[in-house]
Amino acid sequence: MPKGCLVITVSGLAGSGTTTLCRNLAKHYGFKHIYAGLIFRQMAKEMGMTLEEFQKYVELHPEIDREIDRRQIEAAKECNVVIEGRLAGWMVKNADLKIWLDAPIMERAKRVAKREGISVEEAFVKIAEREKQNRKRYLNLYGIDIEDKSIYDLIINTAHWGPDGVFAIVKAAIDHLSPSGDAGEDEKEKEVG
């Protein structure tokens, strides 16, 4: 692992494996895990709302999104953190490594169904509706299109690998991360020098 202070963001849609990866990274490297989804869920619970009800409430109260995002940006000032959130890669502009996890919606629906003890069909509908609402909200609030993956350093389709395989890919990326952030420049210096 590169020496110094690392800030890694992990983003992805529901059921893509972001929490599993972040927990594995935190355990292996001793990173602090900042989880925007947990903050969101806790706020829903505090207000006595289901996740779906809170999702609709947040659409009318953008200050909630801004508070979650502020906490992510603040956390990025720490060393050796992994920040998990759909917009983490967008919010933490100076992250050393920005990761997007993806999987086909049916695969993600199966995972969510298993996790939440609901049918795959119900999970599919919930995910599709939530993603539609989130995309609209992020566009309106920040001008961010969640489907734009151009800011990410590493994009992994988690349908192809289990949690251990995804972790191995990300571990390799972290362990070989260029300290300057531009591996091409390091290579040029080696060639010239």
Swiss-Prot record:
It comes from the Archaea. It catalyses: CMP + ATP = CDP + ADP; dCMP + ATP = dCDP + ADP. It holds the Pfam family Cytidylate_kin2. One of its GO terms (molecular function) is CMP kinase activity. Its main location: cytoplasm. The keyword Cytoplasm applies. Its EC number is 2.7.4.25. Keywords: ATP-binding, Cytoplasm, Kinase, Nucleotide-binding, Transferase. It is found in: Cytoplasm. One of its GO terms (biological process) is pyrimidine nucleotide metabolic process. NCBIfam families: cyt_kin_arch. Belongs to the cytidylate kinase family. Type 2 subfamily. This is Cytidylate kinase.
